[in-house]
């Protein structure tokens, strides 16, 4: 009887040890993911995008010796009301630190499904450039609404603030060392600063508070290969989606 009790106690102790180790690994990986994103998110907000010409980023062997790199920033808002198309509006801008010039495009998309249920991409792009911190079209645009949207567009990096990132707790952590890929998801409230900023700038048709998703691929300690994206997911279900995504990263320049 005593031996059985001792074995039971030993088994329970080992179980608690395994759980503790697993929990510790999860906490450690969460801290690593946060640290990896903090390198970039600590730069937010950058009200004057031209400041990026003088900002350093992570560099590795993928960069030529004399290449300062190109910052690529993107932000998009996607809204799909129940039973309707997924409507997306966003912008991509590449700031070349060598030439101190920036160009990109504003885009709109309405993704619908055809008769066979396959999504049909209908993206329209409007080329833009940045001059004196102002984004302007490089070709004539007849649609006044599109022109106004481009004129008023702001990237999250210009108004977002992640100083409270370290305070986000109990995230849903995922890590695959083989890819490698990683993510951390946190439930936010509508009182969160960035959520308020998004609601201020976009007509978001839900009162649900979003989840913040930090996701990336490549070496957690830093890599110019792969990506790091952040996403605010308000609604995610079949036939109905509302999310905002954003990214900022330094890549080797295509034209030096």
From Swiss-Prot:
It is found in: Cell membrane. A lipid is attached at residue 25 (N-palmitoyl cysteine). The keyword Signal applies. It comes from the Bacteria. It is a lipid-anchor. Residues 1-24 form the signal peptide. InterPro entries: Csa (IPR007595), Csa_sf (IPR038641). Keywords: Cell membrane, Lipoprotein, Membrane, Palmitate, Signal. A lipid is attached at residue 25 (S-diacylglycerol cysteine). GO terms for cellular component: plasma membrane. Belongs to the staphylococcal tandem lipoprotein family. This is Uncharacterized lipoprotein in plc 3'region. It comes from Staphylococcus aureus. The lineage of its organism: Bacteria, Bacillati, Bacillota, Bacilli, Bacillales.
């Amino acid at each position: 009887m005593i031996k059985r009790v001792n074995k039971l106690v030993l088994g329970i102790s080992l179980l608690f040890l395994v759980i503790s180790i697993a929990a510790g690994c999860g906490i450690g990986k969460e801290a690593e993911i946060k640290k990896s994103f903090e390198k970039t998110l600590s730069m937010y907000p950058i009200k004057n995008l031209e400041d990026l010409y003088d900002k350093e980023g992570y560099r590795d062997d993928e960069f030529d010796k004399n290449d300062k790199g190109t910052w690529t920033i993107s932000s998009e808002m996607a809204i799909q009301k129940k039973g309707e198309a997924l409507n997306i509006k966003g912008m991509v801008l590449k700031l070349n630190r060598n030439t101190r010039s920036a160009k990109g495009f504003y885009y709109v998309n309405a993704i619908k499904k055809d008769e066979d249920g396959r999504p049909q991409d209908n993206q329209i792009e409007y080329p833009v450039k940045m001059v004196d911190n102002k984004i302007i079209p490089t070709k004539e645009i007849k649609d006044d609404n599109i022109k106004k949207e481009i004129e008023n567009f702001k990237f999250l990096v210009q108004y977002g603030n992640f100083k409270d990132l370290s305070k986000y707790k109990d995230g849903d952590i995922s890590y695959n060392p083989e890819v490698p890929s990683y993510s951390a998801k946190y439930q936010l409230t509508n009182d969160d600063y960035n959520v308020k900023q998004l609601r201020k700038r976009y007509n978001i048709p839900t009162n649900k508070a979003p989840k913040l998703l930090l996701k990336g691929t490549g070496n957690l300690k830093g890599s110019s290969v792969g990506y790091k994206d952040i996403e605010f997911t308000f609604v995610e279900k079949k036939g109905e989606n509302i999310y905002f995504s954003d990214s900022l990263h330094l890549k080797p320049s295509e034209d030096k």
